[in-house]
Every structure is written in C-alpha cells, then in structure tokens.
C-alpha cells in the first residue's frame, strides 16, 4: 500500500506515505510544476478486504512532508481533481462508508487549497461518488458518477436507484442527473458501479461511461402473430395445415433448420 516514487524509470522505488495514518490509496493528483501532491485515501473497489482511509492529504514538496486536509469520515475517496486555472480549487469524489450508511459522501469542493470543504453533490446516505471527471476545455463542467452500494458480512448490495451520472456547468454549484430514465442509460434498482472518461472527437468533447448493469432487459418487443411457430403447429388440424401459405411454411422449415430436401411443396 501507500504512495511510491521512482526517479530511474521504475528500477527502484521510494515510499513517500509510510508515516501517514492510512495504507490504502483511492486516488492521487500531482502538479508536476509546483510539486504539489494530493492523496485521497481508502480503496474504492468495495471488496471484503477494502480497507478504509482517513481522509485527504496534501504535500507541497514532492511528498517529503504531508498535511492532513480533512474529510475523516470519507473512508473511501475515488477521485481528486484540481482546477488547472486555480490550484486552490479542488474537487474530491467521496464514496463513503462501505459497511454502513453515512452522510459524508458525494462530491466535495475546496476553494482555499483544502483548508475548508463544501459538499456540492449529495444523493443519499447510501450513495457516494465513484468517479469524477472535468471537461478539459472548461473546468467548470463536471461529470460525477454516483454508486448506490453497501456491504454486510453476509451480503453485498452493489446496485440501486442512487447510482447515476450527474452533470454541472457551474463548478458544482448546481447539478442535473443526465442518466434519467428517458436518457437511454440504465437507471433503476439494477444500476451499479459507473466509470467515466471524456475525450475530444472531431472537435467535440464526448463523455463515455461504463456501467455494471443488473437491470432486466425489457420484454416489450411485439411478437409477430402471423409467423408460424412450433406452438401453433402443435395444435393445428390437418385441414388448417393443408391451407397454410407455402411461403409461411417454407420460412418455418428454414428457421428450424430442417434439411433442404424438406420443402413446403414436399411436406
């Protein structure tokens, strides 16, 4: 666990975080110009062996010294983002407790380099932020993925109505859920973990999402009543069979992989 640094292309590593109060890391953010590193602690995979963290930490000297910056009840931090135009503006995705509900989850924002935090996106005490991305052309445009999950000693509920994708156009002041039922994205009790990314394609920034989906597929596809099937054939009288349209019978034979020697004319 912890955070490690290499200065020789991976031939050797030096631990940077061993003296801190957490061995599990959820996400890191490094500013290669200033030497500032942010570490969000706590593993987010939510397995039985996923250990909780102790909040978020900041170093301004490439990890030589660290300052704890709060969010002690976050337990599992999924993402740390920093505004490229103002390093004092920091966004943190907080997944929250694994084995219990708690209110310290969602998306948090700091305007003063981590001295204070405001919760800017909250779904419920069971749903936290599992991913968070920023539009590369506009840092005020944010997308957050919430995950409705809780683990018990005997069970893992890994999907729920609290899971979804949320979008902000104003730096997190307001949000809209863009994965609502009419959006085409899975939404409901079976929606699980979601991963997000954004990429420029043909001059436009496009968002991609991967989802662990347990929602049942809709069975509202209308059945073609005019098509001959085995159930109809089973209850058909000899007279009805004799009056069958040859095209319909031929299609039945081919759909059911009868040998080519059996045709509508021959049967």
Regions found by a protein language model. Name each.
Residues 1-267:
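Beta-propeller blade termini and top-face loops
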């Amino acid at each position: 666990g912890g955070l490690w640094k290499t200065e020789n292309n991976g031939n050797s590593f030096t631990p940077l975080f061993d003296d801190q109060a957490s061995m599990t890391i959820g996400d890191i953010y490094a500013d290669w110009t200033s030497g500032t590193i942010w570490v969000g602690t706590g593993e987010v995979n939510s397995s039985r062996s996923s250990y909780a963290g102790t909040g978020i930490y900041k170093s301004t000297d490439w990890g030589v010294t660290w300052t704890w910056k709060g969010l002690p009840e976050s337990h599992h931090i999924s993402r740390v983002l920093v505004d490229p135009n103002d390093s004092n503006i920091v966004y943190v995705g907080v997944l929250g407790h694994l084995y219990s509900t708690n209110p310290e989850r969602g998306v948090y924002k700091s305007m003063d380099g981590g001295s204070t935090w405001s919760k800017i996106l909250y779904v419920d005490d069971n749903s936290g932020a599992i991913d968070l991305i920023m539009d590369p052309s506009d840092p005020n445009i944010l997308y957050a993925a919430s995950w409705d999950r809780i683990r018990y000693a005997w069970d893992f509920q890994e999907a729920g109505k609290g899971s979804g994708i949320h979008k902000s156009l104003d730096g997190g002041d307001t949000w809209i859920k863009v994965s609502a039922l009419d959006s085409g994205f899975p939404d409901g009790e079976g929606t699980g973990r979601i991963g997000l990314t954004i990429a420029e394609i043909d001059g436009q920034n496009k968002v991609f999402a991967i989802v662990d989906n347990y929602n049942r597929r809709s069975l509202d596809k209308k059945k073609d009543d005019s098509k001959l099937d085995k159930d109809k054939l089973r209850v058909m009288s000899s007279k009805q069979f004799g009056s069958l349209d040859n095209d319909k019978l031929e299609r039945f034979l081919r759909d059911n992989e009868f040998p080519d020697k059996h045709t509508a004319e021959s049967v």
